[in-house]
Amino acid sequence: MKIKHLLFFIPVTFLVACEGTDLIEPDNVSKEQISTQIIYNPTKYSKQKGDVFVKSSLPTTMAKQIPNACVTSIMEYANNKVFGGTVNEGAYILYYTQTYNSNPLIDGVSLDYIEPFVTHFFKTQTFTNYKSAIDAKHPVMTDVNSQIESSAHNVLCVGYNSNTGAAIYMDPELACMYSVNAGYFLQDYNITRWRN
């Protein structure tokens, strides 16, 4: 069995926006850096000097997700593009439907089930911080705000820029990578390995 790295699940307790060039994470924010507004908006990724990725030559686009299937889309992207696996998104959808008696294409993946669902396919560990995770070649499954009430949208942080501090993530709904301050993310799931 070949083991690969991916990172998973510890909720971030606050969001902050900071000035400067450091990645904005709870473990490196001083009170002087905290702003009253989140001032960083995601921008479409474009290659820059200082980009660091979990894998070199990672595709910056992907197939657009099926509605409500951001989690399973990101799982397929992580397995196939980051780790070189071959699992089709349909396998994740079928497993979730049979195990949790719920169709993720209608209901999405419940926050109550996301941890056991992801850990069935990926070996996970506690989130530390984005820079350390990416430097260790561990992508970070995380969430951003959703326009759907009482829900979040799942994305995969796959890099950062060492000059600007921006986190780089794949968004399955938009089917391409974006750059943003890491304070934009809602929660972090350290995915350390995939199981095959």
Q: Where in this protein do the model-derived segments appear?
A:
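Intrinsically disordered, low-complexity peptide-like regions
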Residues: 3, 25-26, 169
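Sec-dependent signal peptide recognition
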Residues: 2-9
